[in-house]
Structure formats: structure tokens, C-alpha cells
Design a protein with these regions (language model features):
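Conserved Rossmann-like nucleotide-cofactor binding loop
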Residues: 43
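Nucleotide/phosphate-binding catalytic cleft detector across ATP-hydrolyzing
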Residues: 1-40, 48-166, 173-196
Length: 197
């Protein structure tokens, strides 16, 4: 608030983050009953239904992009005895995404790490299957939160959400396969905001 006044604002009003997100996305709530926003950021996930009257319901969790990176680092260490850094884990997460098909998945991504056996640098080719194994428990908890919010949403608003889709924002929103997975789990289409971060 002080920062806004310092740069010349005459009046400041604090608003809930989900409402700010709706405004920032340019969504017109006067034309619809409500919108479901899933904000998966680096440090937390916030799932909110916002209507023209404010936040209808929401769910907050610590599931995040950072936890996903740590899960990938742990799976690589456990399976290959190789330590990789957070940047390498994020590269794997964004390159390979969340979905893989056991019969067709040939996507791989190479990253460098340190062998815990030889303590020497090594390069490793990681498949989408390995990344999915790391991300699945976190995604399960995120989708449990989405399901919980959907179940608490009034039918009139839910009809609008079904028609317009779920809006994905935050750094993890661009994860390959995420919007397709949202559709599979919720039976509602999802789209990534133009500027999700």
C-alpha cells in the first residue's frame, strides 16, 4: 500500500489475489457467472472460483513447481544415483511434461549431474516416464484440490465454468500435457492464460 502511495496513487484498495488474477487476465465476469482459476506457482497452488460478487470458494496448498523440481531430483538420485540441480530438474519438468504413454513415449531429455558413486560429472538421458513418476503424487494432490473446489461450487456457476473452461495460470501452467490432464480428470476443458506467470 505504501509503495502505491509513494508512486502517486491517491487511493489504494487491497483485493484478493484471485480477483486480481481475473482482472489481470481481462476476464469479463459481467458476462458469466464465474470462473475457475488454478494458479500453480513456484511456491504454492491456489484454486479459486471467482464470481462477479467475489471469491466463491478456494483451496490453497503448498504443492508447487518447486516441490515438483525436488521430486524429480529425488527420483533421479534414487534410480540413477546421480545428483542433479534444481535447474536441470526444471528443464526435465518443462521439456517432458506430465503425460506419457507407456507404449509410445520416446521423449527423452538429457541433463548433467554428479554421480554419487564416482563423484564425477555425468550426462543422463531421462524419459517422460521417470518425470511422470516424480510428478504424479503432487499432481494427484493438486487435482484433489480442484475436485474439492468443483464439488463446493454452486450449479449455476459450475455450468459457466464447464462452458468456458478452467483457466491455468502460474509458472507451471505451461507444463506439457497439463491442460489435457485437467480435461481427463475433471471432464472440463482447460486453457493456459496468455501470460500465465
Amino acid at each position: 500500500r505504501e509503495a502505491a502511495v509513494a508512486v502517486g496513487a491517491r487511493k489504494t484498495v487491497l483485493i484478493d489475489q484471485p480477483i486480481a488474477a481475473v482482472m489481470g487476465l481481462g476476464l469479463k465476469l459481467d458476462r458469466m457467472q464465474g470462473v475457475l482459476i488454478v494458479d500453480i506457482g513456484g511456491g504454492s497452488t491456489k484454486i479459486s472460483v471467482v464470481s462477479r460478487h467475489g471469491v466463491v470458494n478456494s483451496h490453497f496448498s503448498t504443492e508447487s513447481g518447486m516441490l515438483m523440481d525436488e521430486a524429480i531430483m529425488n527420483v533421479i538420485l534414487e534410480k540413477y544415483h546421480i545428483r542433479i540441480g534444481r535447474k536441470a530438474a526444471e528443464t526435465l519438468k518443462m521439456a517432458l511434461g506430465v503425460e506419457w504413454d507407456l507404449n509410445r513415449d520416446t521423449r527423452i531429455c538429457e541433463v548433467c549431474g554428479i554421480s554419487t558413486i564416482t563423484e564425477l560429472p555425468v550426462k543422463i538421458a531421462v524419459t517422460g516416464e521417470i518425470v511422470a513418476q516424480a510428478l504424479n503424487p503432487i499432481l494427484y494432490r493438486i487435482f484433489s484440490g480442484i475436485t474439492s473446489v468443483i464439488q463446493m461450487t454452486p450449479p449455476a456457476i459450475l455450468g459457466d465454468i464447464r462452458e468456458h473452461g478452467i483457466v491455468l495460470i502460474g509458472g507451471v501452467a505451461q507444463l506439457k500435457g497439463l491442460k489435457e490432464l485437467v480435461l481427463k480428470v475433471t471432464d472440463m476443458k482447460a486453457h493456459v492464460a496468455d501470460h500465465p506467470s
